[in-house]
Structures are given as structure tokens and as C-alpha cells.
Amino acid sequence: MGNRHGIMRPRRLASGRSAAEEEEDGEGEPGSYEAACSADPELGTFDTALRRRASRAITAVASGVEVRSLSLGSLREVTGCLLDMNQEVVRVVLDCKRDVWRSPDLFDLVEDYFEGSLHTLDFLAALDKSLHRARDSQLVLHLALQRHHHEPPAAASASELYASTLGELRQFKAAGEPFTDEFFAAFQTVYRQQMSMVGKLRRRKRRLDRRLRSVRVWRRVSGIVFLTSFAALLVCSVVAAAIAAPPVAAALAAAASMPVGSAGKWMDSLLKKYQDALHGHKEVVSAMQVGTFIAIKDLDSIRVLVEHLEVQISSMADSVEFAERDEEAVRFGIDEVKKKLELFMKSVDDLGEQADRNNMRMCHILPEYVFFINLANGNGMSESLFEMMNAFHDICRKDIKFKTSHYYLNFLSSSYQVYIAVA
């Protein structure tokens, strides 16, 4: 079926170029970060864990690059890696919350980081609608194939049975793609917002670094936020390279296994390997140097699964067309559809699990963020916080799984206490 929509879909991470161009000189961060690691044991521990986890994800992605594709197992490894890193950032920020509150600039940095999660709510709602449409298409196919397989011969002649089955298969084909304009518009919006936020993070980090070089908490929090973001985009770039440029992904995987010191030096080494492999494709290198928030990886992994699902839907539609040509070809065509339906069902389920992980991550972070912002504002309810709470409630209210989850109950409790505090 292909892309029948007018919206251009994101295919790679080169959209980060504009943000990268705003900050041309990125050489200061690794050295500054290494000095902070030497002075702060906790940051050094984080550095070691980050490198180990990111290296494992890069190796998993690069293991299948010869076929220019990603296994679901490697996607799970990458997503798990980036979710773990993001949760560690949340922990460090909350541990240092009082010091963060005392520094307005540092507080703004952390606030920008957390508010980036809010932009994904509309996208997740659009994804949920698309998954429901995909499951409806799956049900149409399943019923058509079941009737053909189980209906007694006496109930209808073979030709009538085939005609009935083909009618239902045409119904599936007429339904079109489950991923509509709304879905791709939401994807593009969130992707652009995340990349814009990355530029703000980097500019603010540099400004504050000049003013607060001697402040230990700032160096710890800003270093962890930046390096986590940096590692996230590095892994994202390997995911993109696994499909578009397998030799690049292989070179990165080889470089990831080299013992070169701290994560700062390790990532710098990977960047050099990447630059050599691309033979001067500075656009991609610049995009990698920007660093990014975890949501970009969430979106990129979902995009890969969506595109994979669209290929399967298109393939099944081709099987339907083949079955329409000749009644004798119907049986073979239906057998082909059965095989593809199994892959289709698995892809829908995997995509649903990916979306659930995103939702649960947000359910876990937002209650903590509510208290963090509320306390920092002296128990005052800001307009953005109020909008965030309403948006979150709208999402949760539509999904029975959220209503019964401890994440949702925690958020309800958090919201109630916030309302009481500002009443």
C-alpha cells in the first residue's frame, strides 16, 4: 500500500542538523566531563554503567546489519538501554533536588528535560488509535481465513465459499493503512520538538558551565543529563545505520568494544570511527554530536516497527490481488495470507508493547515531576503544570489498563495532593 498520505515520514536522524549548526564547536564537552568524573565518584560510577549498557545495545543492533534490518530482540535491547539511562537521570535529579532548586538556571535545565516527555502524549494517543485500526484489520483477516478453513462443505459450494472469503479479504484491503495523517503529523511534531529541546539543553549547559564550573552538583547533574542524551543519540544513529549503511554500524560496534577510558573518550572515539566510515558525511556526525532526549529513541524504534508493519500489510494486499485473479489460485493465495497474517499479528503486538512501555515510563516520571515542580514553585500551580496534569488524565482515562495500574493511581494521588497544596 505504501505511503498514501501527504506527510513526509522521518527516515533518519539527520533532522538534527539545524540544532547542530547552532552549536558548531562541540569539543569542550568530553574533556570537561572527564574532569568531572575524576572529581566525583558517583559520576564516575554512572559513567562506567552508561558505557557498558550503551556498548551492549550498539553491539546488539550491529549484529544483523548485513541484511539492513533490525531484529525485535535488538530493538528491545536498545529501548531497555535508553529507558534505564533515563530512569537514572530521574534518580540523580531527585537526589540533588534541593541543590537544583537553589539554582534557577539549573532548575530550568532540568525542567526542560522533564517537559520534553509531555510532548509525546498526543503522539501516543494517535499511536493508540492506529493500533486499534490495525487490530481491526487483523480481525477481518482472521475471520475470513477461519471461515474458509472451518465452514462445512455442505453449507456452500466451493466457489461460493471462495467468493465469500475474497469479499472479506477485499474489505481488509479497502480499509487501507491503519497509520493515518494524524499519526504521522503527531510523529513529525514530537520529533521536531525533541530536537529543538536538545539544542536548548546544549546551549544552556554551555552557558551554565562557564558560570558554575566549581559547583559539584551542577557538574554531576549537567554531565549526566548531557552524556545520557549523547549516548541516546549515538545508539539511535547505530539503529539508523543498521538499515541505511551497514558498514558504519559494524565500524561503530567494533569501536564500542575498545577500552579507551571514560565514556567521554569512548564516545569521542566512536565519533571518529563513524566519521571515517562515512567518508566525510559531516551532516550525520553533527547530528550525533548534538545529543538527544530518550523520547527520540522511543520514536525511532516505533517508526521502525510501523514501517515493518506497513510492508507486511502491503504484502498481504498483494496476496489478496493474486487470489482474485483465478479461483484455482485462491487456495494458494489464502495460504500465503495465513502465513503473512502471523507476522502481521506479531508486529501489531510488538508495536503495542513498545507503546505500553512508553506510556508506563511517562506514568512513572510524571508524578515525581509534579511534586518536583510544585515544591520548587513554593506549592504554586503553574499553568504548564496544570495543562500537563489535564493532558495526562485525558490519556489515562481512555485506557482501562491505565485506570487499574499503580502508576495511574500514584499520579491521581500526586495530583490530589498538589490541588490540596494550592487550594
Curated annotation (Swiss-Prot):
Cellular component GO terms, alphabetical: membrane
The keyword Flavoprotein is annotated on this UniProt entry: no
Membrane topology reported for the UniProt record: Multi-pass membrane protein
Keywords from the named record: Membrane, Transmembrane, Transmembrane helix
Region (Disordered): 1-37
InterPro entries: DUF677
Stretch forming the signal peptide: none
Transmembrane intervals: 224-244, 247-267
Biased composition (Basic residues): 1-14
Compartments reported by the entry: Membrane
Top-rank taxon, per record: Eukaryota
PANTHER family in UniProt: UPF0496 PROTEIN 3-RELATED, UPF0496 PROTEIN 5-RELATED
Family stated for the protein in its record: Belongs to the UPF0496 family.
The protein's name: Putative UPF0496 protein 5
Native source species: Oryza sativa subsp. japonica (Rice)
